[in-house]
């Protein structure tokens, strides 16, 4: 089970503003549960910047990503597909972690 989660620094402001409300992860990073509070740090330097509460975790296929997923990531669908392919090249099975910022 994950006890913290990291994001690339480029997503920090989107998370803090509430514009980014989901993250797509591989199976290794999907072991969280609804109601769990996770400290959030930057991937680059492990700097804590907030806490999030997990709302739900659902499997989703890369080929089934939609404009709604992209909007929840604060991206266009082509941007989202490109970013996912950079992070998880060739991976079809993803897990959507929906979250909210803990104030």
Swiss-Prot record:
Q: Which Pfam families match?
A: ASCH
Indicate the segments forming the ASCH domain, all copies. 6-92
NCBIfam families from the UniProt entry: PRK04980.1 (NF003443)
Q: Please state which protein family the record places this protein in.
A: Belongs to the N(4)-acetylcytidine amidohydrolase family.
What is annotated as the active site? 20, 23, 73
Q: Which GO terms describe its molecular function?
A: hydrolase activity, acting on carbon-nitrogen (but not peptide) bonds, in linear amidines; N4-acetylcytidine amidohydrolase activity
Q: Which UniProt keywords apply?
A: Hydrolase
Please indicate which superkingdom the organism of origin belongs to. Answer: Bacteria
Provide the catalytic activity annotation: N(4)-acetylcytidine + H2O = cytidine + acetate + H(+); N(4)-acetyl-2'-deoxycytidine + H2O = 2'-deoxycytidine + acetate + H(+); N(4)-acetylcytosine + H2O = cytosine + acetate + H(+)
Enzyme Commission number(s) from the entry: 3.5.1.135
List cellular component terms (GO). cytosol
What is the top EC class of this enzyme, as a single word?
hydrolase
Q: Which organism is it from?
A: Shewanella sp. (strain MR-4)
Xref: CDD domains: ASCH_yqfb_like
The name under which this protein is listed is N(4)-acetylcytidine amidohydrolase
What is the annotated role of this protein in its UniProt record? Answer: Catalyzes the hydrolysis of N(4)-acetylcytidine (ac4C).
Note the Gene3D superfamilies from the entry: Hypothetical protein
InterPro entries from the entry? Answer: AC4CH, ASCH_domain, PUA-like_sf
